[in-house]
Amino acid sequence: MKIGVYGASGRIGKLLLEELKGGYKGLVLSSVFVRQKCEIDFSSFSHKPLVTNDLKAFVRACECVIDFSLPKGVDSLLDTLLECPKILVSGTTGLEEKTLEKMQNLALKTPLLHAHNMSIGIAILNQLAFLASLKLKDADIEIVETHHNLKKDAPSGTALSLYQTCAKARGYDEKNALTTHREGLRSKESIGVAALRGGDVAGKHTIGFYLEGEYIELSHTATNRSIFAKGALEVALWLKDKAAKKYEINEIFD
């Protein structure tokens, strides 16, 4: 399957290119979208991709777009994909509601998956979080996430996704149960989400379930960002030949 990388100059974009250098389980890098002059050397790649700032040409040259860009860039990508539907794997976080609506419209035409975290371990953590939230009905739930000091969004999209999982399991109102800043006593039907920023931490997420006399913590730590690139490529393989729909990363394990 031909892969197009959107956001190639970013941290994960560069790792995607590295994974695709010699091909990845039958996936071939066919196109790379760049807004400015590309300084990437593709001479060692098994297949030389189309490198372009023409969004339509970029999309036409591939069968699946993998997006790790910025929120403002996803809108124009979706507009092009709505005209020329291709499989989409998107790991861009911080998207506005109007952008998510466009994504839902695209899902009527092609299979796509948008996840705040492409790590397989985080997908499993989500499932464990749902089970623990359901079974430990009296436990207070608190989520803590830690990332490098250059991360722009806080809390992280992954932490918010874990929050949504826990809130759904408990039947909480997702809009009102979230607490990112606390003063005074803790509200019973609330879930705290705290964000720590420092150094070069790739990502750590911990969910605590606090009971009287004991507590359980579920934690995931990313020690290498390559897991996000490999996870996105595995998602692309999984989406191949799937029906048009917006899929969730947890469905990979169903």
Swiss-Prot record:
Annotated binding of NAD(+), by residue: G7, A8, S9, G10, R11, I12, G91, T92, T93, A115, H116, N117, M118
One GO cellular component, as annotated: cytosol
Question: Quick one: which residues bind (S)-2,3,4,5-tetrahydrodipicolinate?
Answer: H148, G157, T158
UniProt keywords (A-Z) are: Amino-acid biosynthesis, Cytoplasm, Diaminopimelate biosynthesis, Lysine biosynthesis, NAD, NADP, Oxidoreductase
Mainly localized where?
cytoplasm
Q: Which GO terms describe its biological process?
A: diaminopimelate biosynthetic process; lysine biosynthetic process via diaminopimelate
Q: Does the keyword Ion transport apply?
A: no
What pathway does this protein act in?
Amino-acid biosynthesis; L-lysine biosynthesis via DAP pathway; (S)-tetrahydrodipicolinate from L-aspartate: step 4/4
Q: Which domain of life is it from?
A: Bacteria
- Which is an annotated Pfam family here? DapB_N
For the ligand (NADP(+)), the binding residues are R35
Q: Which reaction does it catalyse?
A: (S)-2,3,4,5-tetrahydrodipicolinate + NAD(+) + H2O = (2S,4S)-4-hydroxy-2,3,4,5-tetrahydrodipicolinate + NADH + H(+); (S)-2,3,4,5-tetrahydrodipicolinate + NADP(+) + H2O = (2S,4S)-4-hydroxy-2,3,4,5-tetrahydrodipicolinate + NADPH + H(+)
Active site at which residues? H147 (proton donor/acceptor), K151 (proton donor)
Q: Where in the cell is it found?
A: Cytoplasm
Protein name (Swiss-Prot/TrEMBL) = 4-hydroxy-tetrahydrodipicolinate reductase
Organism, scientific name = Helicobacter acinonychis (strain Sheeba)
